[in-house]
């Protein structure tokens, strides 16, 4: 959003209140889009990150309306062909309230050759355990896999996400491939390591598997562990 060359193309879309995702900072920095501006005093007006609606706002905050949010995403994701304007829509949602609720619209996005990013936040079975099974997502990737032009990833660390996003932008906006990305993320608080120095790391991330660390090479017993998302940290 700080890059003036790319920020006008970005379309951040959020259902619900966005605070679970730690994205409330957007409210004051770039504002929530409202075609008539703000007509009320928000409940949290005394807070630094209170709701701020503007005619020039950029965040599409659709409330508890996943179908509406996904429809907005499809509109932006197909603007390249309908309006000859390339946009970068990024729809961030509770991963249990994504494909499980709007799978038909996700399929329609594939049919429409949409280009953009879907971020299934709060993914994994440990992220929001206090709220019960409604946020215990361990299967949204199975549903996403039924859409042929949906590219899916379940990263754990920041460098993985950066590599995936860069490749997504290259494929969709440089190579003009008709694909869209579904990426699951977590809201757990943990430290992120540096990207491994191995020259094959970036290629491995994009292929879906890369080496993070070696176990003791002098031991006779060799264990190979494969994991992603929330469970990867426990495996390490």
Q: What kind of region is each of these model predictions?
A:
Residues 170, 200-236:
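Long hydrophobic segments that form regular secondary structure
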